[in-house]
Amino acid sequence: METVKRSKVKDLLQSSAYGTEVMVKGWVRTFRNNQFIAVNDGSTINNIQAVIALNSADDALLKRLTTGAAVSIVGELIESQGKGQKVEVKVSHFEILGDSDAEKFPLQPKKHSLEFLREIAHLRFRTNTFNAVFKVRHALAYAIHKFFNDKGFVYLHTPIITASDAEGAGEMFRVTCLDFDNPPRTESGEVDFKQDFFGKSTNLTVSGQLEAELAAMAFGEVYTFGPTFRAENSNTTRHLAEFWMIEPEVAFNDLTDNMNLAEDLLKYVIKHAMDTCADEIEFLKNRLLEEEKSKPQDERSELDLTAKLNFCLNNDFERLTYTEAIEILKNSTPNKKKKFKYIIDNWGADLQSEHERFLVEKHFKKPVILTDYPKDIKAFYMRQNDDGTTVRAMDILFPGIGEIVGGSQREERLERLEKRMSEMHIPAEELYWYLDTRKFGTAPHAGFGLGFERLVLFVTGMTNIRDVIPFPRAPKTAEF
């Protein structure tokens, strides 16, 4: 029976209760000289050192102290004799809770590539890098809920299975119970989805926005935070097939209110992560600096991770229209010298990441909010401006990443919305429930979408989006 209560490594590392008996349970990170055990229990990125007195333990037991083994250690908390931490545990007793075969365990104490760790995503949590990344991810998720809760928003759970395409992109995963080998057919030979589970064609959701708009017309302020899915065959470092989205919708807000809310949210959650994950962010900053050393000088970032985060906290976001941005880009040196991969030569072009990053990193040197985009490159639900060619859209651009938030004031005028849906060949009968909000007490409202993994990517400094979600889903990738 345990007589000593287990302590977390994080608490012990901050303790000065020297001479007290403590118990630590965790996993062996390293064991050297048959004496020094580095133990981590997941409560912190840092290990605690446990010291076994020479010749005090059975050789057979010592041989089982391998990297990855789960252990329980009881001993005296003492002032550390070495550098790096102020305390260590002088071991009086230890036991092996779970063995780890040293020859088979893939995470030996050496540097592993991120590509290799992606292949063993079920074990990569045990590395310092991913311990840090997912602690930051947790902190950001908590901060998002706290931000909206403190402002009186209602957290809305929107459906994962839907019959609508909120973005009109058509890149959706179909949900069906029909027999693939012998699906029922209509008289015209098409698959008869009326005989399917839901009695119609259904898909995994691409966005909870439309449903959030319905709730905003009753609660005033709502937000969603859940998984979304895109069957986009993009095998890049910036795309996932399954990712998480934060989507607030606020009744009576206009585009300016929307920009203010998004800027406040981003600054709040970044500050929370910096305040609560200081050790993790410091580790990730140093990891990034080491990685940068292998790059040519002109490819290295001008800002380290902490400076980049402060760059967003300490600057008011620059606000300008798409039209103003196009003029800046057309007259920019990289555009004139054809250094851009995509040359800007006309109004109406869809901006690429290189253009967005130029505006943020080179021209304004602060985060940027672009507004009033051409209606032809934006979704049907965005409110049309009086000029007939632009809509009240907004994108927030960050250094190193480009677009991190996309949103708009929504079109609350029924006739305008119906006309735009017709122009874009979106069947009104399939979205009758959405149009009903414009028939019964319609009101101005606005909202935006924040891709959670893009946010985590930015705050951690990681460069591949598959490294900021526990088990990434992408083309030909659905392990674990």
Indicate residue ranges for each PLM-predicted region.
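Metal-assisted phosphate- and nucleotidyl-transfer catalytic regions
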Residues: 165-172, 177-192, 264-396, 423-443
